[in-house]
Amino acid sequence: MSESSTPNVKYSRVLLKVSGEALMGEKGFGCDVEVLDKLSHDLKEVYDFGIQLCLVVGGGNIFRGASSSSPFGFERASNDYIGMLATMMNALSLQNALEKINVQSRVLSAIPITAVCETYIRRRAIRHLEKGRVVICAAGVGNPFFTTDTAAALRGIEMGCDAIFKGTQVDGVYSADPKKTVDAVRYDRISYRDLLSLDLKIMDVAAVSLAREHSVPIIVFNLGKRGSFADIIRGRGLYTTICN
């Protein structure tokens, strides 16, 4: 691909956090095939820029550990482990969607499940990136009480990513939920400190604190819009940058 076709691409390695909810579309549960197809093509567009791409997937479309304790009566740790297995299902689905369109990828799990994927090892993950493979990280950080947002921050930092991209259902960070508050204000840029002090729950405190400590910017955008990831990578469209 020529340089003229990829203007303003300033990243060499990025991490995208994909929530489980983003994969279910309008179904209400599980993975929507059309959503997987759209997302895989959006990822391929960025991949074709020559950018090394790693993903962290959530599992909320199948099981939400933190919010499932009350109806199921399970202890929180057990809920979280079930949620980690849900992320594995999503990761394998996304891997297959990518490889259908000839994008080589590897699933690496924080919990050893060697019959279906590799165990996450930092140097192995980086080597896959260097070989031109998309790395899909599953099972969060491998421990209960940590969200997949925190896993995204951790993996992004330890793999030396230039930025962490958080795909949501809105085009950035707002002062309030724009779907409920008409006069909610969208931020083009906001500091980690202000995000935390205003209690804007776009990511959990641990994830934001990790990114802040290591000065890795978090970029929040609407993942549901076709081609939005590639646009944001090129500095186009609407998004919010969280930084110092």
Swiss-Prot record:
Q: Which UniProt keywords apply?
A: Allosteric enzyme, ATP-binding, Cytoplasm, Kinase, Nucleotide-binding, Pyrimidine biosynthesis, Transferase
Q: Do you know which InterPro entries this protein is assigned to? A: AceGlu_kinase-like_sf, Asp/Glu/Uridylate_kinase, Uridylate_kinase, Uridylate_kinase_bac
| Binding annotation for UMP | G59, D80, V141, G142, N143, P144, F145, F146, T147, T148
What Gene3D superfamilies would the database entry show?
Acetylglutamate kinase-like
Q: Which domain of life is it from?
A: Bacteria
Notes on how activity is controlled:
Allosterically activated by GTP. Inhibited by UTP.
Q: Pfam families, from UniProt?
A: AA_kinase
Pathway membership, UniProt = Pyrimidine metabolism; CTP biosynthesis via de novo pathway; UDP from UMP (UMPK route): step 1/1
Query: Has the keyword Zinc been applied to this entry?
Result: no
Where are the residues of the annotated region Involved in allosteric activation by GTP? Answer: 25-30
Q: What is its main location?
A: cytoplasm
Q: Which reaction does it catalyse?
A: UMP + ATP = UDP + ADP
Q: What is its EC number?
A: 2.7.4.22
GO aspect biological process, one term: UDP biosynthetic process
A Gene Ontology term for the protein's cellular component: cytosol
Family, per the entry?
Answer: Belongs to the UMP kinase family.
How is this protein organized at the quaternary level?
Answer: Homohexamer.
Q: Which purpose does this protein serve, as stated in its record?
A: Catalyzes the reversible phosphorylation of UMP to UDP.
Q: What is this protein called?
A: Uridylate kinase
Natural source organism:
Ehrlichia canis (strain Jake)
In the UniProt record, what gene is named as encoding this protein? pyrH
